[in-house]
Amino acid sequence: MPVIRFYDGSQQVYEHSVSLIEIIKNKKPSIMKSLIAISVNNHFSNLNTFIREDAFIEFVDQKNYKALNIIRYSCAQLLSYAIKNIWPLAQIATSNIIEDGFYCDIDFKRSISEKDLILLENQMKMLVKREYNILNKLISYSEAREIFQKCFEKYKVSLIDENINCNSKVSLYYHENYADIDIGLQVFNIKFCKYFKLQKIGGVYWKKNKNNKMLQRIYGTAWTNKQELDKHLDYLNELEKRDHRKIGKFLQLYHMQEESPGMIFWHNKGWIIFNELQNFVRVKLKEYKYEEVKTPLLIDKLIWKQSGHWDNYKNAIFTTLSEHREYCIKPMNCPGHVQIFNSRLKSYRDLPIRMAEFGSCHRNEPSGSLHGLMRVRNFTQDDAHIFCTREQVRSEINDCIKMIYDLYSTFHFKKILVKLSTRPEKRIGTDSLWNESEKDLSDMLIENHLSFEYQSGEGAFYGPKIEFILQDSLDRNWQCGTIQLDFYLPLRLSSFYINEKNEKKVPVIIHRAILGSIERFIGILIEECSGNLPTWLSPVQVVIISITDISSGYVKELFKKFSDVNIRIECDLRNEKIGFKIREHTLRRIPYILICGEKESSSKKISVRNRQGHNFGMIDVDFFIKKLQKEIITRNFYQMEE
C-alpha cells in the first residue's frame, strides 16, 4: 500500500503498486504535454516505472524552476551524441552544465572551427526532430566499463574507475544507441531541447591539470522557450558590442601578444586612462591621510615562506634565480609593506600607519583563464595596509568604508553589493577574537546604513572580510573592493610596536583595496560605458575639425588655446567631407567635436557637438573652455547638456 507524497505537500494512498502514468492521470493529467521529467525520491524515473513502496514524487514541467538545468543536462549529452555521429573517432571526455548553458570537452585530432559549430548545431537540430525518448539505466560497474572500453572511450573508463566503487551501480543515459555517464537529471523526450545555440570553442586541460592533455571545449546555451533564448542571445550580442578587447583595439588603448601572455602593452591613449585613474586614487589617498610607498618586484623566497604565501600560493608565484638565491616576483604587496613597518621601531603613538602602493604584481594564472584586461598575469593593485592597534580597528574600518564609497560614487554604477565573509572552519585565533572582529565589521556596515549579506565560512583563515561588488548596467557583478582583517601576517613576520606600558604588542593589519586591479577596473569601465568614458578619463577630450582650408589658421589657434589649459585636444585638417569627419570622431568616442568653418573663424566662436549627437550651436570659446574645465576638474561622469 504505497503512500505517494507530492512536492506541493499533498499525498495519495494506493491499494497496490501503481505506474507513474497512472499517478499522473490521477493527480494532474493536464501536465502530460509539458512534462519533461519525473523525480522519484530525487532520482530520475521512466513513465512506465511502477511504484511499490512509499515515495516522494516531483513532476517537472517547463514552468518548474528545475526545468532549465534538466534541459541543459540533456543538451550537453545531445551535443556529445552529435559529435559522435559526425566524428566517430572523437573521444568525449566530459560534459556538464554551467551558468546560462552547457559544455562538452572532447579529444579530437584537429582543431574545431566556427564552421564545425554550425555542422554540430544542425546535427543536434536533426536529432531533436526525431523526438526520441531518453532512457536511464542502472547497470553494474563491470558492464558500464565494458560499454565504454568497446567504444574506445578512455576518458569515460577513467571517470568510472576513479569515481565509482566496483560494487556500485552506474547510472547511464541513452540517447538512442548512444550511452553516456549520468551527469544530472534529463528530459523524458529530446523534443524539449529545441531552444539551444552553440557559441564558442575553448581549451581546457583534462581534470584542470596542466600536465594532462589539452582538450577542446565546446560551449552552448539552452533555454525552455524561444523568447528566453532570443533574449539571452540579444544580451550576448550587447556584451560583444561592449567587449573591452574589441573597443580597446579599435581605440588603440593597448594590445597583448603571445610572446608575453597575460601582460599588457599600454599604448599612449590607454596609458592616459591608467594614469588619470591612478592620479584620482592618489587624490583620495592624500585626503584620507595615507602614505604612498613602493616595494621591490623581487623579494627573497624566504620572506614568502615566512609569510605563508609560498605554502598557499606557490603554483601562482613566478620565481627567478640570481647568484644561487631564489627570488619571488611579488604576487601581492602585503609582505613588502610589513618589511617597511618592521624597518624601524614603532610606538603606539605612531599608529595607525596607512601604507598605500600601486604595486605591480605578477601571478601565474593558467593560460586558458586569461581574458583581456579582466584576467592577466601582471596587474597593478591599488593596495593599502593599515597597521593599527586593536582599539583603532573600528575607526579605521569606518574610514575605509567612507573612502570606498567616496571613490565609487564618481563612476555611477547601478548598485554596490556588500558581503561580509565570516570565520571558516580552519582558522587561527580564539572564538572571542573572531566574535569581536566580525562584530566590528558588521557594526561599521550598520553604522554606515549599508545593507549586506553574510557569507558564512567564506572569510580567510586569518580574519573576516568585507567585499564590495559593483553591479553594472548589464547586471553583472564585479568584486573590486575589500576590507580584510589580518591577525596572522604580523605574527608570522614578527611585527610589533611598543605600547604605553613599554611592552611589545602585535599590530592588527587591515588590507584595503578599492579598484582592485587598475587594469581590470579599466576593462570594467570600458564595458560599462561602451568605450564612452567620462571626459576627465577620455584620452582625447576634444577634437577640432575644419570645414575648409580657409579656417585651418583658426583651428591651429584654437588648438593652442585648449592645449595651454591642459585640455587633451586633436585637430583634423584633412580635406574630407564634414559628415565623414564627424562620424569618424564619434566612433572614436571623443566627448566633444568642435566644428570650425568660415562663420566660426570670422566671429571667433566655435560650433560644439557632443558624441551623443547633441548640437550646442555656435558658442563663445572661453565660455565653452570654462564649462569643459569644470566638467573635467569635478570628474563629472556625464557630459554637459547646454
UniProtKB/Swiss-Prot annotation:
It comes from the Bacteria. The keyword Transmembrane does not apply. HAMAP family: Thr_tRNA_synth. This is Threonine--tRNA ligase. It is an enzyme of class 6 (ligase). The lineage of its organism: Bacteria, Pseudomonadati, Pseudomonadota, Gammaproteobacteria, Enterobacterales. Catalyzes the attachment of threonine to tRNA(Thr) in a two-step reaction: L-threonine is first activated by ATP to form Thr-AMP and then transferred to the acceptor end of tRNA(Thr). Also edits incorrectly charged L-seryl-tRNA(Thr). Homodimer. Zn(2+) binds at residues 334, 385, 511.
